[in-house]
Every structure is written in structure tokens, then in C-alpha cells.
Amino acid sequence: MAPAKFRAATATALSAFAAMSALLIWAFVQPGTLGMYRWGYGAPILALAALGVLPLVVALAAGSIGHKTPKVGTVAGIASVILSAISMLAAGAASAYIFSNAYGAEATADRPAMIDPAKGLTPRMGPDGSATLRVALSSDPHWGRDASDAKARSAILRLSQAEHEAGRLDAFFDLGDTVETGMMAGGWKVALEDIHRDTPTLPFAGLMGNHDALIGGKARFNAAFGSSSWRMDAGPVHFIALDLLWGPEGFGQRDRAWLESQLSSIPADEWTVVLSHSFFYSSGYIDEETGKPWYDHEDMLRRVAPVLAGRADLVVSGHNHYMEWLEADGTAWAVVGAMGGKPDPVPSYVSPRSVWISQGQFGRLVVELVPEGLSCEFQDHGGTRLFQRTLRK
């Protein structure tokens, strides 16, 4: 292969490599992409990476082989140019598809009655004159997925709105995976329209889930719900929301320091409720597709749980599609991924920390400040009690 042709093939391959590298670097900077890769869903990413590297490998091989067998080197050089063209087309097409969806026209729909975390919630006065607060939490409705149960999620929201109108419910917290694919405006539009229809006046707050973040979905989440990491005070009850999508991939030293400072600032005789999408303790199963265990999250338990144990009274998460109550290290841990997303299979692993679990049912967790303490009640989507625990100081 002639030196000039080798240089041209190598330059073309380097351009293809640079284009694909830029796309992949952007993708991995986005929230949730590293978690998606670590949890075994990185096949498309690996395919794009291979397509970016292969032309350069072939071009370098062409230069090496060309000294001994010019004809083979020439064929390899031509192959490198063809592969480079395919790689650049793939990078361009993927970029156009992702960016046009993630940063395209906004999802035009009325937003729910969003709570301003900085203003918090004002507790009501109970019959005995003491402060009372009652909120509902659920997670993983997955708008945009055919297998989701639209009737169940609507029933949960409508029940919560009716209780709010009756003066019995103060707020609703959606703990993530609101939509199936976060970068798509269509899913957000339908979700926001449905939430606004079913809960027109109910104060609402949302966390970002791993599906909400797909890929570049953070901009659409922020437009819909605002920040997903905050502290919200409601009299003697304090809510702390953490940005934990697949796990602690994005939980750095700054996040840990912020969490430590928030926990330390709450009086010991008041209530601390921590919210996240990814679970900590949970029963679950082995994912047949990836071989990954969807139960007792080792990374979360190693890196984040020690900060919360014994300091947070209650930690509520989604991600796994169960309703479950667990107790460990002086803290109660709840999973409530039951807002209509396809139920997860019957657990093949039951966490040693599990006290109660429901599989295959949709519902919510109702947390209420009562004179005895903090009442925590799982209900099905019709409001029937399934399990209740009262936390006491």
C-alpha cells in the first residue's frame, strides 16, 4: 500500500474514531449511562465502540501488511475506508436520533402542581391540636411501555387526589421511572397529561429513575419535574431526595458531604425520610437476560447505606417492582415500585431483612405523622390496607 494512501486511510479512520468517541463520551457523561452499562445493558454501547475502533485497527493493519504484501495491504486499506464511512454514518445517525429527541421540541403539556422543595409543606392541625401530615408515595409507572397497567396507576393517582380534596392527603411523591424512555418527548407528554388530569391540584414531587434518564433524558425530566435531589421540610418531618438511578454510580464525595450535612442538621426527635429511585435492601431475582442480581444492592449497601443507617428513620425506594418492608441497622427500608409498571417475577431470593412483601399487586405507601409516631401503611391501588407499621422515637 502506497504511503500516501496509507496516510489517507489512517486519517479517515481517525476521523471515524474521533466522531464515535465524541458520541460515547457524551453518552457516558449523561446520568444513568454508566449504570446501564454496569448492569448488563451495554450491548449497543459496545457495538458502537467496536464500530469506532475497527476501521483504525484495519487501517493500521493495512500499513503493516502492505510492506510485505502490497495487494493485501491495498485491499485492507480499501476495507478500512469503507468501514470508516460506515462508522461515521452510524455515529451521525445515532447522534441525530438521540439529540433530536433529547433536545428537540418540549413535551407540551400542563405540569402537575409541583412542590417547591425550598418552601416545603405545611403540616395540618390534627383533631388533638398536634401537627399532622399525610403523604403518599409510589414508583415505576412506566408510561410508554405496553406492559404497564394504565388503569392501576390512574387509580392510585385519582385516589390520592380525592383524599387531597377531602383534606386527608398533603402530597404525592413519584420515585422515578415515570416514563419508559426518558429522551422521548411523546412519553413525557402523555405522562404529564395523565398526571395533571388525575391529580390537578395535589402537590406533586418526582425523582428521576434510570428509565427517565435514558439517554440524555435528564433535560426532559428537569423540564417536567425540576431537580431530583433536594431537601423538603414539613414541620417535624424532613424529606431528603437522592439522585440514585441504577445505584451509586453518580454518588460522589460532594453528594456524600451534602447528605451528611442534611442528616446532621435534623434534630434527633424529628423524622427523617430519605427517598431514592434505586433500592438498598430488597428481595428479588436474577435477571435472565444479564445474569445480574436484582436484590440486596451490594453497591448501595456498601457506599450509601452506612451514611443512612440509624440516622434516617425511613428510606423509601422504587426500581424493583414490588411492595416490601424491610428493617435493618435501626432504619426502616421500603420498596414501592408498584405504580403500574409490569410486576417483577416472584422473588427467588428473599432478603434476610424482609418483614413483609407483596408481588404482583399495584399500590402505594402512605406515610402519616400521628401522635404515636410515623405511621407507614402499604395499600393496594384501591386503598385497601395491606401492611402497616408505626415508627416510634
Regions found by a protein language model. Give the residues of each.
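Extended active-site neighborhood of metal-dependent phosphoesterases/phosphodiesterases
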Residues: 98-129, 183-272, 286-314, 320-370, ...
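Short, solvent-exposed loop/turn elements at domain surfaces
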Residues: 143-150, 248-249, 283, 342-345, ...
